[in-house]
């Protein structure tokens, strides 16, 4: 199982809509944990149970934002065999959305499956650029015009939601291997006013925040495939916090329920 990195990985390109400045949203400096559990599985998937914990830390800094994600899952197959998976990723993205550093690690049963470290730079906002990898080997990946990085992508989706946009055609680079450059179809659904159905364990940071149900279908970049690689859904708050997470791999679905949410003091600039 490869865990999809950066749940905020969506970017608005050539949709005909006009969006507000993506830096206008104030992202909350926070740490959140989620309980992960199997929702459903098709018989052919061979999976009978999934449990685990997902951690997110988002810290706005003086010239950018640091985002850290880590997940530990235990998957049980028919017959009782259990497999543990661990995914961790850290990125730093500049406030002008043109540069990013990243490091990701994916392990299965304690063995390293893949690891990526590198930097990505764009010629300008929504312009093309390149990724320079230092791990696993020194290599370069071209980035197409219109691509944005995860933090800028989150802000762009929030701006689209504020504008009343519901369907978007997207491109995103998440900070990983070549397969994390994806085209994305995003649906922005139900809107919640500030204070409406606020999770009790997140009230301090969420009570005064509007939010939207969102769902993202990720496809291999430039692919004509009819089926996405995976789909992600969650409730997105205007300060960047997410709740009600659903990961859909086709053969099975895993939910993420918010357990804890706390403020992280941001540096004084």
List each model region and its residues.
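Hydrophobic h-region of N-terminal signal peptides that target proteins for export
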Residues: 9-20
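Hydrophobic/aromatic-rich structural module bridging two neighboring secondary-structure elements via a short loop
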Residues: 69-122
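A short, structured loop/turn motif at beta-sheet edges
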Residues: 23-29, 57-66, 92-98, 205-207, ...
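Mature, soluble, non-transmembrane domains
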Residues: 103-269
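Bacterial N-terminal signal peptides that target proteins for export
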Residues: 1-8
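Hydrophobic/aromatic beta-strand elements that line small-molecule binding cavities or substrate pockets
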Residues: 52-58, 86-93, 120, 232-235
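N-terminal cleavable signal peptides for secretion/export
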Residues: 19-82
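Intrinsically disordered, low-complexity acidic/polar segments
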Residues: 43-45, 65, 78-80, 100, ...
């Amino acid at each position: 199982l490869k865990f999809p990195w950066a749940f905020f990985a969506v970017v608005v390109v050539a949709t005909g809509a006009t969006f507000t400045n993506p830096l206008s949203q104030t992202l909350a400096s926070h740490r959140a944990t989620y309980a992960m559990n199997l929702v459903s599985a098709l018989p052919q998937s061979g999976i009978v149970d999934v449990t685990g914990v997902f951690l997110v830390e988002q810290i706005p800094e003086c010239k950018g934002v640091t985002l850290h994600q880590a997940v530990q899952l235990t998957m049980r197959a028919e017959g009782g065999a259990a497999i543990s998976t661990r995914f961790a990723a850290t990125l730093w993205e500049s406030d002008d959305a043109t540069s990013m550093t990243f490091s990701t690690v994916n392990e299965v049963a304690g063995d390293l499956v893949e690891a990526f470290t590198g930097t990505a730079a764009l010629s300008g906002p929504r312009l093309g650029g390149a990724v320079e990898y230092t791990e696993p080997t020194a290599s370069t990946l071209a980035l197409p015009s219109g691509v944005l990085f995860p933090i800028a992508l989150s802000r762009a989706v929030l701006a689209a939601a504020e504008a009343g946009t519901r369907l978007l055609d997207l491109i995103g680079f998440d900070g990983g291997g070549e397969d994390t450059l994806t085209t994305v179809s995003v649906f922005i659904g139900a809107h919640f006013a500030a204070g409406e159905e606020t999770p009790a364990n997140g009230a301090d940071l969420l009570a005064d925040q509007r939010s939207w149900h969102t769902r993202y279908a990720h496809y291999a970049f430039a692919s004509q495939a009819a089926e996405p690689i995976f789909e992600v859904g969650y409730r997105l708050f205007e300060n960047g916090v997410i709740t009600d997470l659903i990961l859909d791999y086709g053969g099975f679905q895993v939910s993420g329920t918010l357990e804890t949410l706390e403020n992280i003091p941001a540096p004084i600039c």
